[in-house]
Curated annotation (Swiss-Prot):
Pfam families the record matches: MMPL
Membrane topology: Multi-pass membrane protein
Keywords, sorted A to Z: Cell membrane, Membrane, Transmembrane, Transmembrane helix, Transport
Family the entry assigns: Belongs to the resistance-nodulation-cell division (RND) (TC 2.A.6) family. MmpL subfamily.
Cellular localisation: Cell membrane
Keyword Transmembrane in record: yes
Protein name as annotated: Apo-petrobactin exporter
Amino acid sequence: MKKHPLHMLGRLVAGKNTQWITLSVWILITLLLSFTLPQVNSTKEPNPKNLPETAMSQQAEALMKKEFPNNAGNPLLVVWYRDGGLQSQDYKLIQDVYKELKASPLKEQSTLPPFDTIPEQVLSKSASKDGTSFVTPVFFNKSAGTDILKENLDDLRNIVNSKVDEDPFKRKINDAGLHVRLSGPVGIQTDAVSLFSQADVKLLVATVLLVLVLLILLYRSPILAILPLLVVGFAYGIISPTLGFLADHGWIKVDAQAISIMTVLLFGAGTDYCLFLISRYREYLLEEESKYKALQLAIKASGGAIIMSALTVVLGLGTLLLAHYGAFHRFAVPFSVAVFIMGIAALTILPAFLLIFGRTAFFPFIPRTTSMNEELARRKKKVVKVKKSKGAFSKKLGDVVVRRPWTIIMLTVFVLGGLASFVPRIQYTYDLLESFPKDMPSREGFTLISDHFSAGELAPVKVIVDTKGKELPIKEELEKFSFVNTVKDPKEGKENKQIQMYEVSLAENPYSIEALDQIPKLKNSVEKVFKDAGISNAEDQLWIGGETASLYDTKQITERDEAVIIPVMISIIALLLLVYLRSIVAMIYLIVTVVLSFFSALGAGWLLLHYGMGAPAIQGAIPLYAFVFLVALGEDYNIFMVSEIWKNRKTQNHLDAVKNGVIQTGSVITSAGLILAGTFAVLGTLPIQVLVQFGIVTAIGVLLDTFIVRPLLVPAITVVLGRFAFWPGKLSRKSEEVQKVDA
């Protein structure tokens, strides 16, 4: 008789003395990879591109570098601000600072405007209309790395501070006196990298502590609380150099944001997989005296669900490879590799640790068989204690589910549907600067510029055209729009004089959704000019660039990725469920319930973020991030519980199979859900809004799955469908006596 593959796996990893071999292999591989390959943190790209080269704004940027080159370098914008108006001493300070920068340039300084020689009266004319703000640039070499730039900015701060009594960089904006902020591309870049580097350490420490505390509270065993963390640690010891190797060879690209979220996913999902096996192991320890036999049975019983859950997440997250938006695409491989290795760790090194510690791993609540308890009581000359039945709440829940399935379905759908109804009201933003803390120096400087200077002049739209040698009324056409403030006279290309660039200042905030919506109007109006002039293929003679155009492309590409990835991911997970459960009906309602849970989480997240935390909008990337994680991880819990119902149905009638499935998986899935939600909630403590928003929405979604979808909605639907829940599998043809189900 052919043995089950999971039975063979159990014999392999949970045989006598194999635990030491398994542990030795893991230690050897971890040490070998750690000392021979780079760690993933050393291969992160500080400023990876998100838009593809085919995007119109990126084509415009490439053309501008060729035809309208700016050899000055990367700009740092030094913002000088004093409420009530800049004073003579402030302009004198600016002159002195630039005089010193001219005499002793910063290491990577490339170009410096001559502010040291410009009279105060002339300088003051370039200040904001209210006289409170003045912006001076310092240009740096484009090849300069972030670390070197950070040192240069520190040197600049020291120069300014050496000429004043009180540090103007640390003075709060609302306080009296001179304020200086470093903004622009260089200031934002250095602040962002510093922010993410601080977030990495904070995130790791907070996640480890949270998981440890939750495990101790839930299982009341110090050893059991540490084991999942050890397993995750070993998994990370292989994941980090593996990803570092792939990134070092240019096969993948990784960024700080992806690594931060991967850390959370690893601890959350990894701990869940460990708990699935540990809970089964504990059950079998109550029946089997041999820890080896108990663990082999546990691996056979839970291994399929763990493998299926990990495979669902791996393939689900792998669909992000289809994304054109860089931030999405960079998530795919690191996350899939991390979960794949974590799944292997849960079924190999975790059993090794469980065998090494044996029953002691559950100390002080050690699980023993009845005969072992009797023997222990005899030796201690005590009466055998009759253990109270655990899981009373799960039993009541199971009873309610099978007795009142329609009531539960209507109530849960009403709650989830009510939350989902807020999704159409969500406002989105694609301005990444809004994702950073309001008190981040470069953002404060940027806010000062936008508040005291024309918003449109801050980031003009660059309209570039190939006139084909014709006189075209493009400027006049662009000036007709009410949302256009000014249009500068065109500049001619350096190499091709027929190429012209118009700088268009918008009347509204160039980073707003309203401004993004004007880009197609500008494009259509210029194409009309081409058409009227008899120039064919107008779309090939026109490029629109600048920050507003880049954000417009971001919006378009993000929406394209959602339209492609969501149906592909649903199809892949549906196929996996069909293969695993052999039921078309179950596949459909499991997918539908998780998708409903996603929309509910998005609606609930908006309620909390907008009305509770005052966020005017959420980042446009959040829906796809949340969908991919919630659908993949949400199916984990469904798979674990439904596989238990399917197993029970082989020996029990339908209602008992569902009821016992809820009871048997209740505590472990609740524990796993709390831990996973907790780890994502840790993201909410970070100063980076895109991570805060993602963490909150995902944590809410996990909680909805844990406490509503998994224990109530899914089993209630299974009860109502009866044997059709298994159709067309063999279980759908299994006969049973009819049992009454109350509506």
